[in-house]
Every structure is written in C-alpha cells, then in structure tokens.
C-alpha cells in the first residue's frame, strides 16, 4: 500500500510542474512519451539515432506528425539536431544537457518509489 501511495504522490507532484516543462510535453500522448524513451535509450546506449530512424520507429504516428513532434521538442530545448560530417542531410537527434538532468531526476525518483 505504501508504494501505491508514493506512486500517487509522485504522479501528482509531476503534474503540478510547469506546463512548459518536459514532464508536461512528453505526457501529451503515448507517442510523445515513446519518442522520449527512444531518444534517451539511444543516448544511454551510445547509439546515433537519426531523425528519419526516429520517425520510422514511432508507431501509430504519421511521418508529418512525427516531424512536428520532433521540431517542437527541439524548439522547447529538450532535443538538439546534429548534422553528420559525411552527409549534411542526415541529422542525429540527441537530448540536451538540461533535459538529460531532468530525465535522470525522473528516473531517480521512480527508483526510490520501487525500492
């Protein structure tokens, strides 16, 4: 029962955060949350994820909608796009430093609840 109450408190605290925060943005839809997990997984595994690969991996999301979501995440400062030296058309998507910290804090709180 304690864990359930802690989880409820955690969720309520997350929802109280500013609507401009990543918490709000990545919970807009399952596709937004999926995008966050794909980018962070690639980053944690030291893999390069291109914008095109991300668009393909986002299930049940059209390519135009995926592009809008990616652009919005970049505009809000959660992700950055890096061009490759080999092919200027190919762009890798990476989390920003500030978003990486938010994500780590989020995971830390989740771990504390589950222990």
What do these predicted regions represent?
Residues 1-6:
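General nucleic-acid-binding
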Residues 7-38:
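Short alpha-helical segments that sit at the start of domains
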Residues 18, 104-115:
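Amphipathic alpha-helical dimerization/coiled-coil segments
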Residues 39-43:
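Short helix-to-turn junction characteristic of helix-turn-helix DNA-binding domains
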Residues 45-57:
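Short acidic, hydrophobic short linear motifs in intrinsically disordered regions
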Residues 60-75:
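Short amphipathic alpha-helical interaction segments
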Residues 74-84:
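A short, conserved structural fragment
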